[in-house]
Amino acid sequence: MEFSFSPKRLVVAVAAALPLMASAADTPSTATARKGFAGYDHPNQYLVKPATTIADNMMPVMQHPAQDKETQQKLAELEKKTGKKPNVVVFLLDDVGWMDVGFNGGGVAVGNPTPDIDAVASQGLILTSAYSQPSSSPTRATILTGQYSIHHGILMPPMYGQPGGLQGLTTLPQLLHDQGYVTQAIGKWHMGENKESQPQNVGFDDFRGFNSVSDMYTEWRDVHVNPEVALSPDRSEYIKQLPFSKDDVHAVRGGEQQAIADITPKYMEDLDQRWMDYGVKFLDKMAKSDKPFFLYYGTRGCHFDNYPNAKYAGSSPARTSYGDCMVEMNDVFANLYKTLEKNGQLDNTLIVFTSDNGPEAEVPPHGRTPFRGAKGSTWEGGVRVPTFVYWKGMIQPRKSDGIVDLADLFPTALDLAGHPGAKVANLVPKTTFIDGVDQTSFFLGTNGQSNRKAEHYFLNGKLAAVRMDEFKYHVLIQQPYAYTQSGYQGGFTGTVMQTAGSSVFNLYTDPQESDSIGVRHIPMGVPLQTEMHAYMEILKKYPPRAQIKSD
């Protein structure tokens, strides 16, 4: 059959199609119209738009007056109804990748179903571009201080009693406590074991959990993991004598930590279940209180070494210890959520679900990400984490690629407690810079847009990259050593290299960050470089801090 092109016919055809196209644009597709998804937000278009400085010691923000006004009205009406400020729950997974959960395309597809997590996510705001720091401890400190690692100074996870932590920093739990909140920490801490950095001394009324990280309790005891240590009395005794806590502990504000039990590999199997039970009891207690609460809940799963509870062993289609622990984490989250639901607390509770970094690709079996890199790197796979926020009746179900950093939880929670926007600047010393941006109106506004213009990435205390819109500019990158395998994903054993200055990637067309467009699209690099230089000016006035580092 012969095809002939007619410009006249093309014009007529396009004209006839325009009404249909407009109608289709106004109507969600079948896929996005299903219950729980009101549609997908367009990403930010902030590349060449200026941000506004609201306080000298706070990150400049993109302002949206209409959504700010709507949000404050919603909060005022809710407080009038409930008689108290909203509760905040942060549910923080460990080493879980962006694509481990069903709401990001994983779950069943990767052999570890997360049905309850996905169900709640579908009724909340799924954040496809939420960012952590490259590893655990820096991220946890970022959540509790509102600062990037370069400012709070925890650049690496402290290991085996290494000194340093949150001491001397202004923390979210302390500020919320000052506002009348009951503050509870449960689970993994890993922000310093020295007394001044322990949770009961940095703002929490109560703490139940462990001070460090899973593998530090088990790797020197498990003959299947480290036989060269576990089977050597001298070596295992050496580790045992190092000055780090080896127990599941409990403490109350200002008190001493009390050991509950020695954390052996066998005890580790039940740890997440024990912590979950403690969390349920806390929520039940708060259901009878007239005070708002802040629950910071850090799971043990799914950091290596994974010891799934006996009833979850073999429960995942993947049949791996990691997959089994993911199934267990789904149930832990579900039990906490159902307790809030049973108690009628969902109407007045912001739930934040997230992970502390990307998957730990150096220790299989591990999590998954569709992006380049993994934990320990500033490639997207190392720092883009599975995240959603949920608040019954307050957050419109949708997805957004608006940029969010976990530092944003600090000013956002303080906004809910009665300190919106620039008021946060007065709660911290003038020498403290808040890298977080108040995202309350983004979360609660109708089709809200992110208030954050840019994401900044850090490696070993240095500014490594910046992202605005879909574009990302690297000045430092992490690459594997020459002896590692070609499929290496990046982590703590890589090497940091400086780029030649034109490493710009379009994360929409190249999520693997494999084909730089810096030379072909120089105009895209200009605003990114400008943003990087602007943050360097911030660092001159508010210098970097390094208290826990790799060297």
Swiss-Prot record:
According to its UniProt record, which cofactors does this protein need?
Answer: Ca(2+)
Chief place of localization: periplasm
What positions does the entry give for Ca(2+) binding?
94-95, 136, 356-357
Cofactor binding description: Binds 1 Ca(2+) ion per subunit.
Enzyme group, top EC level?
hydrolase
Name the Enzyme Commission number(s) assigned to this protein: 3.1.6.-
Q: PROSITE patterns this protein is in?
A: SULFATASE_1, SULFATASE_2
Q: Which GO terms describe its cellular component?
A: periplasmic space
Ordered alphabetically, the record's keywords are: Calcium, Hydrolase, Metal-binding, Periplasm, Signal
Q: Fetch the SUPFAM superfamilies from UniProt.
A: Alkaline phosphatase-like
- Cellular compartment(s): Periplasm
Q: Where is the signal peptide?
A: 1-24
Q: Which GO terms describe its molecular function?
A: arylsulfatase activity; metal ion binding
Annotated active site: 136, 190
* CDD domains in the record: ARS_like
Q: How is it modified after translation?
A: The conversion to 3-oxoalanine (also known as C-formylglycine, FGly), of a serine or cysteine residue in prokaryotes and of a cysteine residue in eukaryotes, is critical for catalytic activity.
Q: Which InterPro entries match?
A: Alkaline_phosphatase_core_sf, Sulfatase, Sulfatase_CS, Sulfatase_N
> Which residues are annotated with the PTM 3-oxoalanine (Ser)?
136
Q: Which function does this protein serve?
A: No E.coli strains have been observed to have an arylsulfatase activity. A 'latent' activity has been observed by heterologous expression of a genomic region linked to tynA, but it does not map near aslA.
Question: Family per UniProt?
Answer: Belongs to the sulfatase family.
**What's the name of the protein?**
Putative sulfatase AslA
